[in-house]
Amino acid sequence: MVIDIKKWDDVPNDKMKELFLENPYPLYRGTPLGTDLMKEYMFTLAKKSASINDTLVVLVDGVPMITGQFYLIPYLSKYWNIPIGGLGHIVIRNMPADINTKIIDTFSLHLSNLASNAKFVSVTIPGPNIALIRSFEQRGFAYAEGFINMVGSTNYFRDQFRLKGLVIRDLVENDFDEIDSAYKKTPFPARFVSDGGFDPEKARKLYVHRCREVYEQRLGKIFIAELEGKFAGALIGIIDKEMAETINIKTNTLSGMGIIIHSRALRRGVSMHMIEHRQDWYKSEGVDYVNFGANFNNRPMILGLDKLGFKYGSLDVALHKWI
């Protein structure tokens, strides 16, 4: 068995494509969106990113077994004034147990080394791949967050979570003070808030900053909930325009889709009502299926999504490390 370490560009394109198509990240699994067309699109995105990112491919006897990339995250680097990076586009081939550990350890070591120019780096790994998670932990990465990705049809019968007296409207400028207040008063799991290396107050404002970015750049739609005449919550909705234009599949983006409920409105059904409302909006925009990443410690959210017709798609575990 000969193990080689190469860059993406040094591996034949057909071999890299086969790795992605035969061992895809389980996006939209169990829905009509999980097609070969979607798999090819994800390969195209990874290939495009490989042209500008630091890349790594581990091969065994000339066959690509696992690949990943290191990239800097400009908006986070600018916000925190330090180089913040990510490890992504990770795809791993099913391997016999006797070679799995050695290859994974080789991969995690070399991919971690690519991040040496960053001060803080995160990696998201499919939850079932315990060996890969453990290998990154041996490199000094620690648990940050865990998410269950659930996928739901916009055609699913709803109207079961409509909360009497709740009004949902579009965001206006004056709402930002209330959003800021909600993030201060409502506990929520977030790696930049819980990690001791970041200022928690500034970390919370990062999420307010994201809402303003969506609002000012018109990246999507922000729904505001009012209950008994008071601000109750905010929810972002964004359609992946690049995917829609490239392969004619309309669905939501997989990040930047936060929801925040004000402390005075917690445990009253506001979040489910808002998600129901957003599903209706997605349907009106021609979206058939929506992905929702729920923190896997948030059992009420997961149960509520299940009642809305969302089904389990995949489990992700996020790890991070100060370099």
Predicted segments, located by residue:
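Conserved acyl-CoA
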Residues: 102-119, 264, 273-289, 295, ...
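A short gly/proline-enriched turn/hairpin at secondary-structure junctions
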Residues: 191-199
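Conserved beta-strand-loop-alpha-helix junction that forms the acyl-donor binding cleft
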Residues: 122-131, 261, 291-302, 320-323
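A short beta-loop-alpha structural element at the N-terminal edge
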Residues: 2-21, 167-190
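Acyl-donor-binding surface of acyltransferase catalytic domains
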Residues: 92-174, 316-321
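Glycine-rich phosphate-binding loop
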Residues: 97, 269-271
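Active-site rim helix/loop that mediates acceptor-substrate recognition in acyltransferases
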Residues: 21-55, 200-222
